[in-house]
Each structure stands twice: as C-alpha cells, then as structure tokens.
Amino acid sequence: MLDIKVIRENLDWAKEKLATRGIKPEQLDELVAIDAKRREAMVKCENLKAERNEVSKKIAAAKREKADASEAIANMREVGVKIKELDQEVDELQEKQEYILLRLPNFPADSDPIGPDESYNEEVRRWNEPTKFDYQPKAHWDLGTDLNILDWDAASKVSAARFVYYKGAGALLERAVYNFFLDENTSEGYTEVITPSLVNNDSMQGTGQFPKFTEDVYTIVDNDDPEVARNLTLIPTAEVPLVNYFRGDIIDGKNLPINVTALSPAFRSEAGSAGRDTRGLIRMHEFRKVEMVKVVKPEDSWKELENLTHNAEHLLQKLGLPYRVVALSTGDASFTSAKTYDLEVWMPAQDTYREISSCSNCTDFQARRAQIRYRDEDGKVKLTHTLNGSGLAVGRTVAAILENYQNEDGTVTVPEALRPYMHGMTKITPEVKWH
C-alpha cells in the first residue's frame, strides 16, 4: 500500500508515476480530497475532545464547590453527540481512503522501462546461446507423453484441464529439481521453511493479492452454506505465507536481512488466460514452485534485488539452461513491485524464451499493508522492505530440461547437477505403459 502522505505532498509526481501503471489522475484527486476531509474532521473532533476535557475539569470543580454546572453539562452532552458524529465521519472517510489505496499499485522505480505492456520490456543480459539441434526438436508435452512420464489425459479425467500426472522418471525429475533448488538456496544463506497452503484474507491482502485479484485464486467455501466463505484461500505462491509470517511484527534490525525459501504447491485459476498455453506445463492450475523471500532494511533493498536475481540465475546456470534477464516495463510489472526482473528460459520447440522466475523489489508496499517493521539501532521503528523471487518454478524447469536436453531418439539426458538426486540416472528412457 502506498503512503498517503507521500501522495498528498507530491501529488503531481504521484500522478505522473502511477499514470505509467494505468492509474488515472482523477483517482488520486479523489483520494486526496477524501484525505483532506478526513483530516479536517479529525482536527474538529480532537478540538472538541480537548474542549470536553477542559470543561469536564471545570464541571468537577464546580460540583466540589456545590455550584450550578447544569448548563455546562448540557453543552457537553451536545459536544459528545458531535464527537460521536465526527468519529463516525472519520471512520467512513478512512474506509473510503483505504478502499482506494488498497487498489493502487506500487510506484515504479525510476529505472523501469516505461510502457503499457510486455512489448516495452528491456533485455538486460543473456547467458549461453539458445540450444541448437540438427533436427526439429519436440515440444516438452510430446516428449513427456512419448516417454510416458507426463499424463495430462488422466489428470483431465480425474481433475480438469491444466492438471497433470508425473510418473516414474517424470516424478523423479520433478522431485530432483525442487530438492536441488532447496539445497542450492539454503547453501546461499536462505532458511528453509515449510508453510501452510491455506491462508486467510488478511494474509492475501498483506501481500497484495486481495482485494484486486480475487478472481485469480481458489477460495475454500463452507459446504453447509456455499454462500459463506471460510476466509481461507489456496496459496498462489509461497510468497504469501512467507511474507505474512512477519505480519504485525517488529523485527530487531540486527537480524536483517532475513532470507527464507520454501517449496509449496501453487494454485492459480488462470482467469483471463483462456486459449493461452493450453498444452504442456507452462500454465497450470496446480504446480510446485520454490520461492525466495527477503525482508531487509530500506537502504539495502536495491542491492538485495541484484542478489536475489543472481540467486535465481545461479540455479539456471548450474542446470546449463540458456536464459535471458528482462527488466519489466511499468505496465507489465506486478501490482506490488517497484522493479521486477524476469528470468526467461530458452524453449527450443517454441523457439522463444519463456518466464521461469520473477524477482521483485516491493519496497515498503507490502510492509505497509502487513505492518512489517523493524527497530533500528537508535530504537526507532520503521517499515522494512520486502523482496520475492521464484527459485524456481518447478514445472517450467522440467519443461525446459526436457526440451533442451532431448536427444534425436526421443530420450532425454539428465543434467549433471541433477544426477545425484536421480539415483545416478543419466538418461530418461520410455516408461512401461500400464494400459
């Protein structure tokens, strides 16, 4: 959530910044007008409360002296009614103000490419050349089916479209990938955490998914009354429980930065993505992802964004997967992010790069929503900054391995970094079919 004081005192700047993220200036004018009314009502209310306190002392003194205080008492009853009305007005204006603030995205960093969509993203660097083949490479969904290690048909029968079964070497590969990620992340100083997969609305609001993106997730509904939600949502990413672990806390500044990592299932409704990536592992309703989260001091967050991105790149490099780093435009960056680097892995069958990780600096945006603070060396309490990044999306990594390490005979070579996690297996060959 943005700081209303920053908007109030820098309105033209705020309008210019948020215009690059699709926010109309009229929204900020409305917000500032509501804020002005709220502050005016607060001042009136505080003045009346101060007056009531002073008069109450005089009434008490008059009673001690057995003097008539009936007129003052009657006046104070009227003042009490006005105070109650003003308190209610302040609450209503505060609610309206918060309604708007909760739906405004983070201010973009000055270094962000300016543009309304992904076509304005800027490539920062590449690692390794795209994998070349002397033959037409197969798509990972064809490889997975031919090797009998991925089964979308069975998953569609049991669940719905955009679900998959991993079998045999496919299941072993998936497990190898996320164990490799966790081992590498912890070796880089991250503490591994196992999180809940269901979170409450306060948590979803704290990290910025609610109230703006309620259609993108799955919420648990009471079976006895389908209209009544249980206030629990299946997590779209481990970022939600990892960041909200610190919600409402005041952290000792000596303990910052805090680096945590977690493997979790991720559940996405994929609302609005009909017809896109209908085949394969790229866009699923349920998948596994290893997440990295940093809670840091504000002065360290830009350095930590580079560290976070390096941590994600390190995983792709150890797997030998070609990728590029892209700085997202103001119109393509996530709602909570001030700056995002996407890591895009090369997918030979599609002849293009596809996102496999997003590394974002959310500055104090999530910390303000979730009230994550720290106490500095002078004892002053301040908001932290939070960062998050995929380290990495597991299914997409499996897809990239299948496509980049495929052989002409239809087998897939296992990357050297994963062989210790796959019982020494060097090549994935077709699994026996059950039917």
Swiss-Prot record:
Q: Where does L-serine bind?
A: T237, A238, E239, E291, S390
Gene3D superfamilies from the UniProt entry: Bira Bifunctional Protein, Domain 2 (3.30.930.10), Serine-tRNA synthetase, tRNA binding domain (1.10.287.40)
Q: What is this protein called?
A: Serine--tRNA ligase
Catalyzed reactions:
tRNA(Ser) + L-serine + ATP = L-seryl-tRNA(Ser) + AMP + diphosphate + H(+); tRNA(Sec) + L-serine + ATP = L-seryl-tRNA(Sec) + AMP + diphosphate + H(+)
- Main location per the UniProt record: cytoplasm
Q: Which Enzyme Commission numbers does its entry carry?
A: 6.1.1.11
Broadest EC class? ligase
Tell me a Gene Ontology molecular-function term this record carries: transferase activity
* Complex formation: Homodimer. The tRNA molecule binds across the dimer.
Q: Per UniProt, where does ATP bind?
A: R268, S269, E270, E355, I356, S357, S358
Q: What does this protein do?
A: Catalyzes the attachment of serine to tRNA(Ser). Is also able to aminoacylate tRNA(Sec) with serine, to form the misacylated tRNA L-seryl-tRNA(Sec), which will be further converted into selenocysteinyl-tRNA(Sec).
Question: Some GO term, biological process aspect, for this entry: which one?
Answer: selenocysteine biosynthetic process
Pathway(s) of this molecule: Aminoacyl-tRNA biosynthesis; selenocysteinyl-tRNA(Sec) biosynthesis; L-seryl-tRNA(Sec) from L-serine and tRNA(Sec): step 1/1
Which gene underlies this protein? serS
Keywords recorded for this protein, A-Z = Aminoacyl-tRNA synthetase, ATP-binding, Cytoplasm, Ligase, Nucleotide-binding, Protein biosynthesis
**Per the record, GO CC terms?**
cytoplasm
Where would you find this protein in the cell? Answer: Cytoplasm
Family under the similarity heading: Belongs to the class-II aminoacyl-tRNA synthetase family. Type-1 seryl-tRNA synthetase subfamily.
Q: Quote the record's domain comment.
A: Consists of two distinct domains, a catalytic core and a N-terminal extension that is involved in tRNA binding.
UniProt keyword Protease, yes or no: no
Q: Report whether Lyase shows up as a keyword of the record.
A: no
Q: Name one Pfam family in it.
A: Seryl_tRNA_N
- Source taxon at top rank: Bacteria
